[in-house]
Every structure is written in C-alpha cells, then in structure tokens.
C-alpha cells in the first residue's frame, strides 16, 4: 500500500458532517422539484398563472419552505409551476406563515394602530413591528376598510400606548443615545393631554365662573409725579462779537452747555410728602394725586447763571483762538508750497532755455 493506511468510507464521510448535510438537502430539493416538474409540463415558472392559489400549490410551497427555509424564492418557484418568486414570497408571508394571526383585530390592536398611525403616518411596515403576527398588508387593509372610516367620537378613547412608548419600541438605540446624552442635549418632554368626557364638559359649562378672591402676585406700579425734575432754562447766555459762531448748538461749547443745563437736579425735599413744607393746601391744589404726591422744583440761582456764562465765554475764546491758529498754519503751508514750486519750475525752465518773460507770467499766476 506504499505506507498509506486505508480508511473505511464511513470515517471519510464523517469528517465533514455539515457539508454532507447540505448536500443531502440539495438532493432532496432537486428531487422534489423534479417530481413537480414531471407532474406538469408547463412547470418551471415559464408560463405564469394568475389567480387564486390551489391547495396543491400551497402544500408544495409549504414543503419547499420547510426544506429550504423562507429564502431563495426564485429556487422555490421552480418547483411550483406558473408561480414566480415574488408570488411565492407574498403567499407565504401573508397567508401560509404559521406565525400569522388569523383572528380578527382586537380592540387593543386597533387602538395601537390608531396611536401609531398618528405618530408615524402610513408607514405600515414600521407599524407592523409593533404587532407581532400581523403583516403590513393586513394592517393597511384593516385601516382603510374599518379604522379610517370610524366616526370622530370613537377617536376619543384613551390610547393604550403613548407616543414615547411607540418611539421606544421602534427605535431603542435612539432612545438609549438620548438618555445617555448631557442635560443640554435632552429633548423637551411632551405634555400629556387628557381627553374630557362630554358629561364633564357640560357640567363645567353650567357652572358660573368663579371670582378670583386672591390677588395675583404681579407688581403693578402706581402712577405718581416724580420727585426729580430737570432744569431747562428758556434762555441762553448772550454772546457778542465773533464768539457767536462758537455758541451754536452744534459746536463744542453749545453741547457742553446743554449737558450742564439739562442735568437732573436732586431737590432738597422729596416728593412723597414726608418733608415739611410751608402751605400744604396750596400745593395739594396743584397736585394731581393729592398732598402726599407733590413735585418740588428748585429754580436756578443767579450765581449759577454767572458761572455758566463765564464758562461759555472761556470756551468760545479758546475755540476762536484755536481756529485762528489753524488758519494761520494753513496759510503758511500754502505759501511755502508756492515758493518751492516756483523755485523748482524756474530752475527747470532756465536749464531748458525758456525766456524770463514766461517765467514771470507763471509767477504772477501762482501769486
């Protein structure tokens, strides 16, 4: 035997049990398909058959799905004459699957469909994940035939599932990610809205509105005359000569005077009536709210007017002197520029042989 040990065929076949099992399944499927192909010459799915499924076709589809599993529908369709892979898949998923519920929809399932449809809309494949044993096609047909045409009063039944529970069941990973996020990233909680019954609403409508005995805690300020007044004299300081230009409102001195004149003056007496005053009867007659709310005003004195006049005169003089210096500097700069320009031009013309008469004309034009 040249050193080779002979092994029995049983040991050789037992080395790959998975592969041998798959081969056995494929052989059984091929044999089943061959039998079905012999029974009908039009098999193989080439000539499509439209209409209801026959009991023999349902039995063959059930046997093939048990052997191959609910997958590879094109291979399964070869064993059912006249049926395509899509037709086999829809027949199994909607009718023949043993997991499906064939009883009518219960009230709990209807309420769940209504609440899920209010949140998700017409996403029937997503809604079907909430109802085990119900297909998306069955849910859609039940919604279009029964639930959508129900009167509006039946929608007031309390929903068995809230929106948050629906989202948690459909998207658990998203809910975990939100719960682990920081407080700033949390979504706002939805307010729970209850549905009132018709009897309760009628009782509340019959009851008269109750008066609010307790006052609210909102602060409401009371109107009164202020304790501070603003001094706005009706005349300005007289100015003479050229200083009138600097005493305009747009000038620096005018703005400074306005800021001094219109500053709020704090009176020596308050306006709440707690300070002593000479005649309360005369003051109460002029007040809007009575003697307790009196507005005291202090008039400007003569000394203050003299100080303001002196300040304005000093500012005007300073502004006038500054403007004169600026004008003198600008004139000097212009003269210097003319001299330099004339000198440079004269020297250039002499070098070029220009006549002295033309140079004099240019100097006269510049002067």
Swiss-Prot record:
Tell me which residues form the DNA-binding region.
73-96, 124-147
Report the Gene3D superfamilies cross-referenced here: Homeodomain-like
Q: Does the keyword Transcription apply?
A: yes
**Residue intervals passing through the bilayer:** none
Q: Which residues form the HTH myb-type domain?
A: 45-100, 101-151
**What role is this protein assigned?**
Required for male gametophyte (pollen) development.
Q: Which GO terms describe its molecular function?
A: DNA binding; DNA-binding transcription factor activity
Induction data: May be the target of the microRNA (miRNA) MIR393a.
Which InterPro entries does the annotation name?
Answer: Homeodomain-like_sf, Myb_dom, MYB_TF, SANT/Myb
- Enumerate the residue ranges of region (Disordered): 181-216
Protein name, per record? Transcription factor MYB25
> Mind telling me which GO cellular component terms the entry cites?
nuclear speck
Gene symbol here is MYB25
A GO biological-process term: regulation of DNA-templated transcription
Q: Which UniProt keywords apply?
A: DNA-binding, Nucleus, Repeat, Transcription, Transcription regulation
This chain's source organism reads Arabidopsis thaliana
């Amino acid at each position: 035997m040249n050193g080779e040990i002979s092994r029995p065929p049983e040991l050789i076949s037992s080395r790959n049990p998975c592969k041998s099992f798959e081969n056995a399944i494929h052989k059984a499927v091929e044999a089943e398909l061959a039998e079905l192909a012999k029974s009908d010459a039009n098999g193989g799915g080439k000539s499509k058959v439209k209409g209801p499924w026959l009991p023999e076709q349902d039995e063959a589809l059930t046997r093939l799905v048990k052997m191959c599993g609910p997958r590879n529908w094109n291979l399964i369709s070869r064993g059912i004459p006249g049926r395509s892979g899509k037709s086999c898949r829809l027949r199994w998923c909607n009718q023949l699957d043993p997991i499906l519920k064939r009883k009518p929809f219960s009230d709990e399932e209807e309420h769940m469909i209504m609440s899920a449809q209010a949140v998700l809309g017409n996403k029937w494949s997503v809604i079907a994940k909430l109802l085990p044993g119900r297909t998306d096609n069955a849910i859609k047909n039940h919604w279009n035939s029964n639930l959508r045409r129900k009167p509006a009063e039946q929608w007031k039944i309390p929903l068995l599932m809230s929106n948050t529970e629906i989202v948690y069941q459909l998207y658990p990973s998203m809910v975990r990610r939100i719960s682990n996020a920081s407080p700033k990233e949390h979504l706002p909680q939805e307010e729970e809205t209850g549905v009132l019954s018709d009897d309760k609403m009628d009782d509340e409508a019959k009851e008269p509105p109750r008066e609010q005995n307790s006052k609210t805690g909102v602060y409401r300020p009371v109107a009164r005359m202020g304790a501070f007044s603003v001094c706005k004299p009706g005349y300005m300081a007289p100015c003479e000569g050229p200083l009138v230009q600097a005493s305009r409102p747009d000038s620096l001195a005018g703005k400074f005077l306005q800021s001094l004149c219109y500053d709020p003056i704090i009176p020596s007496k308050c306006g709440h009536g707690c300070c002593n005053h000479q005649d309360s009867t005369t003051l109460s007659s002029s007040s809007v709210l009575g003697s307790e709310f009196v507005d005291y005003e202090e008039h400007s004195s003569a000394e203050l007017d003299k100080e303001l006049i002196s300040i304005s005169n000093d500012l005007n003089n300073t502004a006038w002197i500054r403007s004169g210096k600026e004008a003198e500097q600008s004139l000097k700069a212009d003269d210097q520029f003319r001299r330099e320009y004339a000198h440079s031009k004269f020297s250039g013309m002499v070098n070029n042989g220009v006549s002295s008469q033309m140079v004099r004309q240019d100097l006269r034009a510049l002067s």
